[in-house]
Amino acid sequence: MSWQTYVDDHLMADIEGQQGHHLAAAAILGHDGSVWAQSSTFPKFKPEEITNIMKDFDEPGHLAPTGLFLGGAKYMVIQGEPGAVIRGKKGSGGITIKKTNQALIFGIYEEPVTPGQCNMVVEKIRDYLVDQGY
């Protein structure tokens, strides 16, 4: 299965039981910021934004004072699991980023999708990739 298939058929699929509701954008990136696959709606990001995200995984709390930036959009960092997940909020939407040994999995949502639904979608792919050695 190609990386793009993971994004198109899994990360961007309809939320279970919520026909027509899906993430606003999603991507799978390498730790170096290289794009493995992304939705057409995923924001164009700067390399330093990915560097800062990686630093927060290594040094939890790094992004809290400044916020998380992706594609120039600022997200307020909210509770996450140090070293495993970063969550951010922006208006009625937000972002979930989970890390595997080799990849970062991004899910960006807007209402009516909830933070919990976004977390579940991203976590399912993360767990699968970890099981596959990624």
UniProtKB/Swiss-Prot annotation:
CDD domains per the UniProt record, alphabetical: PROF
UniProt superkingdom: Eukaryota
PROSITE patterns to which the protein is assigned, alphabetical: PROFILIN
GO molecular function, one term: actin monomer binding
Keyword Cytoplasm attributed: yes
Pfam short name (any one): Profilin
Family that this chain belongs to: Belongs to the profilin family.
Function field: Binds to actin and affects the structure of the cytoskeleton. At high concentrations, profilin prevents the polymerization of actin, whereas it enhances it at low concentrations. By binding to PIP2, it inhibits the formation of IP3 and DG.
Name of the featured protein: Profilin-1
Biological source species: Nicotiana tabacum (Common tobacco)
Source species taxonomy: Eukaryota, Viridiplantae, Streptophyta, Embryophyta, Tracheophyta
